[in-house]
Design a protein with these regions (language model features):
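N-terminal strand-loop element at the rim of the active site
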Residues: 2, 7-71
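Conserved donor-binding/catalytic core segment of Leloir-type glycosyltransferases
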Residues: 6, 184-215, 224
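Donor nucleotide-sugar binding/catalytic pocket of nucleotide-sugar-dependent glycosyltransferases
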Residues: 40, 134-180
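Short His-centered aromatic/hydrophobic patch
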Residues: 92-99
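Short alpha-helical donor nucleotide-sugar binding micro-motif in glycosyltransferases
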Residues: 138, 253-254, 261-266
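Nucleotide-activated donor-binding/catalytic signature segment of Leloir-type glycosyltransferases, i.e.
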Residues: 234-254
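Short hydrophobic beta-strand element within catalytic cores of glycosyltransferases
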Residues: 289, 293-298
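Conserved acidic donor-binding segment of nucleotide-sugar-dependent glycosyltransferases
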Residues: 309-322, 331-337
Length: 373
């Protein structure tokens, strides 16, 4: 079956989880010989069309403004209207009001899949403005895919349409850390157990609780936080306030070429997120692929604690409680038997559920089933 698909949604260049998923879908499908293009609003001045391979194009439209994490790109509307009829399936990635508006105005008559990455949690005012458009999108969708069974069953806007809801776990390529880079990182913290976290420095990540947990850890632990964002200054001030300059390190943006090395260098990966905005957390899957035990949070309605199976790939704790973070980290790190159990459990869970191949296989099955209906 010759399938033609368009991934529609979040902006380029790739920084966050949704963009990573769109790009992984585009590459994974195209490398299987399926025609798959990606249309998105550009977050910089790089616009136009780029040929990724024989079966995939990246199409970036000009952004005029950014409002409540939404790219305002009128050009996306005209571009989509011009190309939409070339595709059997449009796979739109939610939440993205701009992409939803473009689809609404496109006149597209083919199959639509909505990938429900997250509810709109923080931007309550935005939600009220776009709710009629979102209700249309839910009605228009032939299939709604979530990233975990927990999230889509709990999403308020999907309660009445569960018959057309399914889930597909996000998979990632197995990380292969460069041994020399791993050694270089570990040599910067000699004799220390390394707790690593990576993500945007924003409120829902709960990094302030991870920093507070450092005060409860012995001196042979260090906490490394990779990523950039608006709360960087506030978090650095916390580190100074609590005199943790030798124990907590805000690393800033981690280049892609050294991402794997930090996973390989750490002893434990910690996800301290506190809000349902954190629906899945691809970073913990990436850490699992390196055999790293996970400490994550039990956020009601989120898939985070489903990804990290408690007692198998690591431990899940109450959000916003630094004492529980410190306790879980030590439970994993202080007993070699426990550490090995969770390390092997993380690797096993990755290979069973979260490989790039498994995700691509699942996606193709959904596409074929939809087109056969």
């Amino acid at each position: 079956m010759n399938i033609r698909v368009l991934q529609l949604g979040k902006f380029h260049p790739i920084k966050g989880g949704v963009e990573k998923v769109m790009y992984a879908f585009t590459l994974g499908l195209s490398l299987r010989g399926i025609s798959c293009d990606m249309l998105c609003a550009s977050d910089d001045d790089d616009v136009g069309e780029t040929r990724l391979n024989a079966h995939a194009r990246l199409i970036k439209t000009k952004t005029l403004a950014k409002l409540a994490a939404t790219m305002i790109s009128p050009e996306m509307i005209s571009v989509l209207r011009g190309i939409c009829h070339d595709y059997d399936i449009i796979h739109i990635h939610y939440p993205d009001p701009m992409a939803t508006l473009a689809l609404f105005l496109s006149g597209y008559k083919g199959k639509v899949i909505v990938h429900w990455h997250s509810d709109i949690v923080k931007q309550k005012i935005l939600l009220q403005f776009v709710k009629p458009l979102l209700n249309w999108l839910i009605r228009r969708a032939d299939l709604i895919l979530g990233t975990s069974p927990v999230y889509v069953s709990d999403a308020p806007m999907l309660k009445s349409v569960q018959a057309k809801v399914d889930y597909l776990p996000i998979g990632v390529r197995e990380r292969a850390p460069d041994a020399s880079l791993v050694a270089m990182i570990r040599n910067q913290y000699p004799g220390k157990k390394i707790v690593y976290s990576m993500g945007r420095l924003v409120a829902y990540k709960g990094y302030e609780y991870l920093i507070e947990a450092a005060m409860m850890l012995p001196d042979d632990y260090v906490i490394l936080i990779g990523g950039s964002g608006p709360l960087k200054g506030k978090l650095q001030s916390m580190v100074r306030k609590y005199q943790l300059q030798q124990k907590v390190f805000i690393l800033g943006f981690i280049p892609r070429e050294v991402e794997s090395a930090y996973y390989g260098a750490c002893d434990v990966f910690c996800l301290s997120s506190v809000m349902k905005t954190e629906a899945y957390a691809i970073v913990q899957v990436e850490a699992m692929s390196c055999g790293r035990p996970i400490v994550a949070t039990r956020i009601p309605g989120s898939g985070v604690s489903w990804v990290n199976e408690h007692g198998i790939s690591g431990l899940n704790i109450t959000p916003g409680v630094p004492e529980e973070i410190a306790d879980a980290v030590q439970k994993i790190c202080e007993d070699p038997y426990v550490y090995e159990k969770y390390s092997m459990g993380a690797l096993y869970r990755y290979h069973r559920l979260f490989t790039l191949e498994a995700m691509t296989d699942g996606l193709i099955k959904h596409y074929k089933k939809l087109l056969e209906e």
